[in-house]
């Protein structure tokens, strides 16, 4: 359960502890009945190995590269496509772009929308939810995609790359399997 920076009350902590204890026992019992684990990334395969001591087959999620065509335009803006949730770390991108005063467009909606609207400087545009066509158009016209979250895999960076755009990502999680470092 995610409580953000707020401290949960004693009753909530106790109830959460009991529920999590039950879920751990159920998880261990359930995993022992699994014939074959399938992971969507090496990152997840490593977690399966660590938590359950089991190997897994690796099958990456697909991206429709015929839908996402390379775009050679560069309208000078950076792009972030994400649900606006705490674990997606959109706030970190907004803070960073506020400090460097470069244009950032954020496509997505969610529980952090109001907070991010208050944080965003004049160089940051929050567009809310958009259709696939609008997202594709923005991929094709952006300078680069910003991806600060730690994801199990991360389809968004692949969609941007299918449009010929570079990705600036946090160096952890599944993104490390699809993004080559410039080091």
Please annotate each region the language model reported:
Residues 5-37, 45:
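Membrane-proximal helix-turn-helix segments that form the acceptor-binding/catalytic region
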Residues 46, 50, 54-57, 62-76:
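Acidic anion/phosphate-binding donor-loop and adjacent secondary structure
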Residues 65, 83-90, 111-113, 129:
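A short, basic/aromatic alpha-helical/loop segment that forms part
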Residues 114-136:
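Nucleotide-activated donor-binding/catalytic signature segment of Leloir-type glycosyltransferases, i.e.
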Residues 135-136, 153, 173-178:
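Short glycine/proline-enriched, acidic/aromatic patches that form the donor-sugar handling elements
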Residues 140-152, 165-166:
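Acidic donor-binding loop of glycosyltransferase active sites
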Residues 159, 172-183:
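Short acidic/histidine- and often glycine-rich active-site loop of Leloir-type glycosyltransferases
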């Amino acid at each position: 359960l995610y409580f953000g920076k707020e401290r949960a009350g004693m009753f909530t902590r106790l109830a959460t502890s009991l529920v999590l204890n039950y879920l751990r026992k159920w998880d261990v019992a359930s995993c022992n009945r699994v014939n074959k684990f399938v992971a969507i990334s090496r990152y997840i395969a490593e977690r399966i190995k660590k938590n359950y001591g089991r190997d897994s087959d690796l099958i990456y999620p697909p991206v429709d590269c015929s839908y996402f065509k390379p775009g050679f335009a560069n309208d000078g803006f950076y792009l972030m496509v994400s649900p606006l949730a705490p674990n997606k770390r959109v706030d970190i991108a907004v803070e960073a772009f506020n400090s460097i005063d470069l244009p950032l467009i954020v496509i997505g909606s969610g529980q952090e929308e109001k907070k991010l609207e208050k944080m965003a400087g004049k160089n940051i545009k929050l567009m809310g939810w958009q259709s696939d066509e609008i997202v594709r158009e923005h991929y094709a016209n952006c300078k680069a995609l910003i991806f600060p979250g730690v994801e199990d895999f991360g389809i968004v960076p692949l969609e941007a790359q299918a449009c010929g755009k570079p990705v600036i990502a946090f160096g952890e999680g599944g993104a490390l399997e699809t993004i080559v470092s410039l080091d």
